[in-house]
Amino acid sequence: MVRSRSNSVKKDLKRKVDEPVDVQDEFDVEGLIDEGDSDDEDEAEQEVAQENVTKDKKNTSKTENEEDADDESDSDAELEALIGEEEDLSGSELEDELAYFSDAGDDEVDPSILKHLDDGVRLRSLSRSSDQTDELKDVVEIVPGADGKPRMIKKEIHAVYDSDDSDQEESNTIGNVPLSAYDQMPHIGYDINGKRIMRPATGSALDNLLETIDLPEGWTGLLDKSTGKGLNISKEELELIKRIQKNETTDDASNPYEDLVEWFSSKTEIMPLSAAPEPKRRFIPSKHEAKRVMKMVQAIRQGKLLTKPKEDPDARPNYDVWADNLTDVQDHVMTLRAPKMPPPTHDESYNPPAEYLPTEEEIAEWNALAPSERERNYVPKKYTALRHVPGYSESVRERFERSLDLYLAPRVRKNKLNIDPDSLIPDLPSPKDLMPFPIRCATTYKGHKGKVRAISVDPSGEFLATGGDDGTLRVWEVLTGRELYRCRLVASIDAQDDSVECVQWNPAVPGMLAASAGEHIFLIVPPTLFDFDIENTGREKIEQGWGFAEGGREQQDIDTKGLDDDADSDSDDETGHVKKKSPPAKWITPTAKQQASGIGAIITATKTIKRLAWHRKGDYLVTVAPSAQHRAVAIHQISKHSSQSPFNKSKGIVQDAMFHPFRPHLYVATQRYVRIYDLAKQVMAKKLMPGARWVSSLDIHPRGDNVILSSFDKRLLWHDLDLSDKPYKTLRYHEKAVRHAAFHKGGLPLFCSASDDGNINIFHGTVYDDMMTNPLLVPLKVLKGHDVKSGLGILRVEWHPREAWLFSAAADGTAKLWTT
């Protein structure tokens, strides 16, 4: 019995060994255990193995036919008998049977196993390529074992999002391969052991019809891709689906309607739930609450926390019948509603009164105006009935402009500044305490035809010299306004381009004055005005220069290398010789007629002279010709009849130039900047940046530390040289361009500005000896009296040498004296 059982076990094991051979054509097995055998031995072994496989197939087919023919009852009986026989086996016999089929070792195959397996199956080792070895390293890790032999340990599998966490095992392991790939094959996939899963048999059309009529239990009409059969659901799954559809709980164990258990009932118990003693904090005042209460008390005392006023229940509420609806919700404090459009007026009515209807002249005038200049966008019309009123054509445009107004003009809430207006006004002394200063016109000097452009007072203060567009130079008596001297400097009256631009009395040589007309500068000693000694001194001062020039002495120019760092070195020609610079002006002897009128010398420049100023010693004269480029500024010496240009390169259009009252400095004002040059050190000492667009004139304080500038952009700028290169004060009191500004040279703290608006502004300016105290500027008076002609007002102002008197020259052809 035992031997028959062992034989049956052998057959079963042999059948299990033979099963993988059926699919030998689907696997590529490479390499054998005996790698050193020759090719002939391999071929012989393959032939023997093929014969054994054929025999096994025949035996297997016979066995299967016999098993199919057996009855089910006989199979059950044999199975019970077989189970009983296995239980009767002793332990030693069972161990012998198991040892018979066990391996002899890990590395070698026992030859006895190959001998007993008469089917000729040979064990083969799988030899792997380099690519397969790399893939194997990603899955397993080879480490040395305890016996010193290599041991393969599989790496830990990390669950990711795509990992499957279901408990149901997949019978078909094709993965993501679609079932359509197996349409032409008899199987539909492979199981976990690599065996084919055969396609299930399909019924006929009649069977399918019967299935749709008599639906089996759990029928879904779906196809299971893993088995190819119909997918049916169980009763439990169907019940779960019904619960989900009814929004019920899926767990039968949970009851959402359990009975209420009153853990804490309304009945008062005698014994407490907890017998712990009361904590100390229950009967001691809280320190934190005391701090909060004190903060609230302080806030109430300071008025930050206000209590609600008590409402009188008997008081009757007052309502504003004209106010908006009180039940509306109040807007947020930061909400700003759009301003409402103005209500329509009487002229917008379809039947306005007659006085609101425009005349034909008014309609023509309205049509002639530009749309942006019209007061209203419609013309009032009258209709007999409202049904006759046509559609309003401007409605779309008005809505669009309304939208633009709301979009481009955002509403912003600004906090109101509670500032006392008096605190914004500087604390200045009263003008009455700063007397004297000019307040009225005392004398008017008439006689010029056209604009009066130049004005100057001699150092004695008795005579006034003026020049204008008529080309004449006139000398007036200050007190009486009588004309004492007249000299025509322009040959023809029709010469519109030439006019007397500047007139200046010599501060050191009495009786001598300089006047410019066009490109010429005239040195004049007016006859019959002064006594013989004064007149003779002035003529000798001019004539001694002719003798110096005739002596053949060379003129020594001022070294101007340091005045202009960017000077061009173009004075050398191609041969390397130094070119001799041509003088910026020529000295010409006047004719006999001109000498009879008092002209002692004529200086001819290259361009029109716009400004001239004397040095304090009276020997040097600086002139400005803006269109002469780098020769715009020229310095002329009277005693030597020499002229020189201190600059080799132009740094802007020069507007004015002056000597410092007592230092060897030259102030040059361009359109944007004022440069101060030190003539002794031959360097630029300072550069002022007034910030004006176009500087018109320049004047220096008698103390030499402050400068005022006038500009065409309606500003008067005060510069403190000890403070900064930026303006100390910017005064904007004029409505048009400021033409000229001047300090009082006689020691009075006064200065003024003249503008094209026809006004003269008088200011008080005190300069303190203390360097820590800023100058005090106080506006005093606005003098009005000149007329504006062709957009031009007052062109020039000049202070009296000693008195608080002011002289002005304007475009209306007159000069005026303003006194206290």
UniProtKB/Swiss-Prot annotation:
Span list, region Disordered: 1-111, 545-585
Classification via Pfam families: BOP1NT (PF08145), WD40 (PF00400)
Keywords assigned: Nucleus, Repeat, Ribosome biogenesis, rRNA processing, WD repeat
UniProt-listed GO biological process terms: maturation of 5.8S rRNA from tricistronic rRNA transcript (SSU-rRNA, 5.8S rRNA, LSU-rRNA); maturation of LSU-rRNA from tricistronic rRNA transcript (SSU-rRNA, 5.8S rRNA, LSU-rRNA)
Main location: nucleus
Family matches, as PROSITE patterns: WD_REPEATS_1 (PS00678), WD_REPEATS_2 (PS50082), WD_REPEATS_REGION (PS50294)
Annotated compartments: Nucleus, Nucleolus; Nucleus, Nucleoplasm
Region annotation Required for interaction with NOP7: where it falls in the sequence: 282-395
Region (Required for interaction with YTM1): 395-431
WD repeat extents: 447-486, 495-535, 604-646, 649-687, 690-729, 733-773, 789-820
GO annotation, cellular component aspect: nucleoplasm; PeBoW complex; preribosome, large subunit precursor
InterPro entries noted in UniProt: BOP1/Erb1, BOP1_N_dom, WD40/YVTN_repeat-like_dom_sf, WD40_repeat_CS, WD40_repeat_dom_sf, WD40_rpt
Residue spans of biased composition, Basic and acidic residues class: 9-19, 53-64, 551-564
Biased segments, Acidic residues type: 20-48, 65-110
UniProt superkingdom: Eukaryota
GO MF term list: ribonucleoprotein complex binding
Family: Belongs to the WD repeat BOP1/ERB1 family.
Subunit description: Component of the NOP7 complex, composed of ERB1, NOP7 and YTM1. The complex is held together by ERB1, which interacts with NOP7 via its N-terminal domain and with YTM1 via a high-affinity interaction between the seven-bladed beta-propeller domains of the 2 proteins. The NOP7 complex associates with the 66S pre-ribosome.
Function (record text): Component of the NOP7 complex, which is required for maturation of the 25S and 5.8S ribosomal RNAs and formation of the 60S ribosome.
Name of the protein in its database record: Ribosome biogenesis protein ERB1
